[in-house]
């Protein structure tokens, strides 16, 4: 099941691809840990929007721990192919990555609803509690896991996609399930995102029509800018891959080899969440201040420990 890597069969291309996937994995792992730690241990960030951001980072962290390492190993050992088509490992990997992606999409929808409520209905927004937010997050995760259960329990075709080094659903053989997943996950989310986003954008473009409370909220709450950048980076990271697949669907398969281009576009989309840490640092002063204070505190504690150890060593002869 886990064949040893044959070092003699490694090529420059396989090493380059494995290095790129490893870099994405490390970046995603480190930034997710930092995001979760700073938000969870900063009281000013532990609000409703902070819970949604932690949910997004947890999905990224699980991807970095359970999904991407399989792609690294498969790149180095080309004959393994994540256990092969329809293997339990391949099905589990496909299930996990689709479930995590669905939970991310649902969380984006809840973020849009939260920002819409804060902007358009500030009097009712105060009724939003952390308990209700956590219930919506749990509901989103359970729904995502249950919707993707047929991948494991049913005889659905899962194939290894060598251009991306990932296991994916054979959409041609699972068209009914694919349409159901599209209607239950992506269509409601897209409608919610575009509807609420357009209303928020229209209101912010006409600040004279806003109430004083709404205008003050827009000017003082950095979460509007933060969530806006999150949506833009998510869209831009997936745009090249979507454009390539749409072109292949419309004009048919091209004569040129697009495997390397597909590989880069897939892992560009996977690496998109790595930008969350930079977005939080540049748009939220509380996140930036907390992170810098943790860094300075850890450096001070480390230097103090070294000083005490050095002092004990110098006085050990007394």
UniProtKB/Swiss-Prot annotation:
This is Melatonin receptor pdcr-1. PROSITE patterns: G_PROTEIN_RECEP_F1_2. Signal peptide: none annotated. Keywords: Cell membrane, Disulfide bond, G-protein coupled receptor, Membrane, Receptor, Transducer, Transmembrane, Transmembrane helix. Coiled coil: none annotated. It comes from Caenorhabditis elegans. Disulfide bonds join 90-167. GO terms for biological process: cellular response to hormone stimulus; G protein-coupled receptor signaling pathway. Residues 42-47, 114-134, 195-223, 283-318 are cytoplasmic.
């Amino acid at each position: 099941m886990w064949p040893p890597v044959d070092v003699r069969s490694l090529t420059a291309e396989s090493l380059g691809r494995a290095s790129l996937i490893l870099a994405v994995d490390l970046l995603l792992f480190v930034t997710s840990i930092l995001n979760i730690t700073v938000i969870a241990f900063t009281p000013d960030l532990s609000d409703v929007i902070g819970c949604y951001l932690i949910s997004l980072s947890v999905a990224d962290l699980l991807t970095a721990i359970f999904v991407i390492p399989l792609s690294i190993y498969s790149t180095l050992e080309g004959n393994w192919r994540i256990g092969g088509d329809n293997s339990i490992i391949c099905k589990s990997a496909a299930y996990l990555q689709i479930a995590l992606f669905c939970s991310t999409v649902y969380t984006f929808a809840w973020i849009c609803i939260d920002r819409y409520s804060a902007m358009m209905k500030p009097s009712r927004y105060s009724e939003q509690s952390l308990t209700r937010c956590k219930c919506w997050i749990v509901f989103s995760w359970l729904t995502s896991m249950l919707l993707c259960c047929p991948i494991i329990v049913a005889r659905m075709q899962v194939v290894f996609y060598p251009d991306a080094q990932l296991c994916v659903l054979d959409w041609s053989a699972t068209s009914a399930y694919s349409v159901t997943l599209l209607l239950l996950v992506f269509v409601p989310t897209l409608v919610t995102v575009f509807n609420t986003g357009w209303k928020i954008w229209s209101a912010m473009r006409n600040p004279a029509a806003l109430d004083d409370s709404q205008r003050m909220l827009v000017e003082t709450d950095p979460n509007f800018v933060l969530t806006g950048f999150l949506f833009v980076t998510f869209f831009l990271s997936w745009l090249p891959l979507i454009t390539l697949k749409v072109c292949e669907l419309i004009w048919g398969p091209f004569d040129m080899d697009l495997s390397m281009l597909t590989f880069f576009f897939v892992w560009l989309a996977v690496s998109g969440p790595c930008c969350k840490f930079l977005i939080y640092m540049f748009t939220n002063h509380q996140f930036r201040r907390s992170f810098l204070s943790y860094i300075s505190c850890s450096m001070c504690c480390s230097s103090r420990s070294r000083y005490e150890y050095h002092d004990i060593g110098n006085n050990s002869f007394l």
